[in-house]
Regions:
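Hydrophobic/aromatic ligand-binding patch that stacks against planar heteroaromatic rings
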Residues: 71, 96, 124, 155-159
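A cross-family acyltransferase "interaction/gating" segment
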Residues: 144-213
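Catalytic-site beta-strand/loop segments enriched in glycine and acidic/polar residues
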Residues: 123-154
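Helix-to-loop junction immediately C-terminal to a conserved catalytic motif
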Residues: 24-62, 127
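Hydrophobic alpha-helical transmembrane segments
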Residues: 2-10
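Residue-level preference for the first positions of well-ordered beta-strands
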Residues: 55-57, 129-135, 165
């Protein structure tokens, strides 16, 4: 019996690896759903505001290192995330970010080539009818407060007109994956157990037409959702 169980486990592992190589997006979303469900009680308000088809941009406050997991587990459509390019260059994570089709981005003064490529990729992704998610603050909060929304969203909308859906995450500040603890995440293992299976909520607002979008307006809407 132990031998049969071992063989069955090995076959399942091989099947999982094969599915990942063929359908990495499906596998990653499955993992996102699995991880979020065992760690949190996740609920979503306003899911009907996500367009059923066509390109759109999601914006969200940046509370922790697992924001993308919660969003991916909650929104049924595939999502491509825009991420600071230096994170995508971390050796052990390069393959993961590539398979997840993460779009690396840099500031104008850092790497103009990366920035230009990011804008082109974002535009093409939206034209292909896919969803792009950005965190307009540009950083994970260190205070729990909402930071200033950068104007990158306005640059994106200069070349293509798509709906923009404002969202906010609630319940992750103070978690093991946030920077509440001396500005460092993943540094207080005891917090992981303390907050285990806490409630996390994703609030999805009504989408805005591209011509009505400014970084300032999105920030105001986010603050209203957070109140």
């Amino acid at each position: 019996m132990p031998q049969i169980f071992g063989i069955w486990s090995l076959l399942n592992l091989l099947a999982a690896i094969y599915i990942y190589t063929v359908l990495p997006e499906f596998t990653l979303r499955f993992l996102a759903v699995f991880l979020s469900r065992i760690a949190y009680r996740v609920r979503v308000v306003g899911e009907e505001n996500i367009p059923k088809s066509g390109g759109c941009i999601l914006t969200c406050n940046h509370v922790s290192f697992v924001d993308w997991i919660i969003i991916s587990a909650t929104i049924k459509r595939p999502i491509r995330y825009v991420l600071y390019y230096k994170f995508t260059q971390i050796g052990a994570l390069k393959r993961f970010f590539k398979d997840a089709k993460v779009i690396p981005i840099a500031g104008k003064s850092e790497d103009r080539k990366v920035l230009i490529n990011a804008m082109k990729t974002i535009e093409q992704t939206l034209r292909d009818g896919e969803i792009v998610c950005i965190f307009p603050e540009g950083n994970i909060t260190r205070t729990g407060e909402l930071g200033e929304y950068k104007r990158g969203i306005e640059t994106m909308l200069k070349t293509i007109s798509v709906p923009v859906v404002p969202m906010t995450l609630h319940g992750l500040w103070g978690s093991f994956f946030s920077r509440k603890h001396n500005g460092k995440a993943l540094s207080q293992p005891s917090v992981l157990l303390k907050n285990w299976f806490g409630t996390v909520e994703l609030r999805v607002g009504e989408y805005l037409k591209a011509e009505d979008v400014t970084a300032e307006k999105l920030e105001i809407l986010a603050r209203e959702q957070l109140d």
